[in-house]
Amino acid sequence: MAYTGRALEVFLGTGTRFPRRIIWALGLIKYAAAKANAELGLIDGVRAEAIAKASLEVAEGLHDGKIVVDVFQTGSGTGVNMNVNEVIASRASQISGLTVHPNDHVNMSQSSNDVVPSAIRIALAYEVERSLLPALDRVIASLDSLASRTENVVKPGRTHLRDALPVTMGQEFSAYADAYRRARMLTEYTYKLLLDIPLGGTAVGTGLNAHPDYPRVAVSILREATGLDLKVASSKFRAMRLLSDIVAVSSAFKVLALDTWRLCQDLRLMYSGPNTGFNEIDIPQEVAGSSMMPGKVNPVTIEAVMQAASHVVGLDSSITMASLLGELELSMGIPLAGYVSLRQATLLTESFNKLAPLVLDRVKPNVERARMLAENSQALITVLAPIIGYDKASEISKAVYEGKGIREALREAGVPENLISKLLDIERLTKPGVPALERGG
């Protein structure tokens, strides 16, 4: 492995290896290339079959210990492409008993410049389709269930962290279910952009030194091998030069991360206490929260997810910078973009896989506590504003703030009992309309 040995000397040695899924994708590309080249009569059958078999072994992870180049290498990804070529060539030579050359045979009809951009797109698309979206669907289902379970649990609304009109807990959780549905639509749309791959573009997108039918044949084989709806890129020049589709996917990841961060922050606030915080929900935990304070239970899974979400947001900046690397015919941020985007997908998938069963499915509303807080909120006075006016309502609100009971303050202000009853019907206050102007009561 002459190239790989030299590469280890000149590339960085940070210990940052390519994700398993990218190596899987590279192995399948080499498999598809060998099969396509044989079908087009460009390579003898014995070598082609040996390369195909060795390539599948690489895809399956049997030679991961030999894929040793660092992510921080040449911007085209030539280092990892040649590392894989040399591993396959060595193994194919053993299988066939013939000399199999890493460039002449394994890399036939290819360049690092079309192979690695294709591999990182295939890897990311696969992870989104097969891992991230199912995990996200589980979170959405859990939020739907939680919203349904708490649809009649009234609690105080809060804006600016100050008392506001009452809402139901179900309304709050339904907001996040809807947000995740919209984020899912964005993620699904953007990841499908990755399915256009530049395989066959060779060095600069023209396809020089590749059979004219090679892209079609190779991508067809890859489509079957990966189970993804892959297509030859509408412009190989674009897909080799720009990483805009990966930037779009990372942006969708960022939206997911931000929505997740907000959900977790709200859960932490609602769980705060038990005696000096909101204490509106309980989340049974199975691990001690403090090494010093006995019996203290902290929202450990929630905080782990928030840290992962923060990392996803930060990694989006790396994707942005990686997309700017390069000039003219080729991006120079391909290895970094591949590594970082897969990392984002893994962080989100693992977060969702833990958030649904360990947090959302375990949330228990503290119904009486939440209702008590809602009934004692001075913001309830807002209901009377359409009748008594904003200024008079503000005076009553001030009296409540200074310690008077709501009912007492209303009576002293001359509010009729029927309006007081409407004001204190907090279930009604979580629905649209103008209760103070409604007949009856």
Language-model-detected regions and their locations in the chain:
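Conserved, well-structured ligand/cofactor-binding cores
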Residues: 2-441
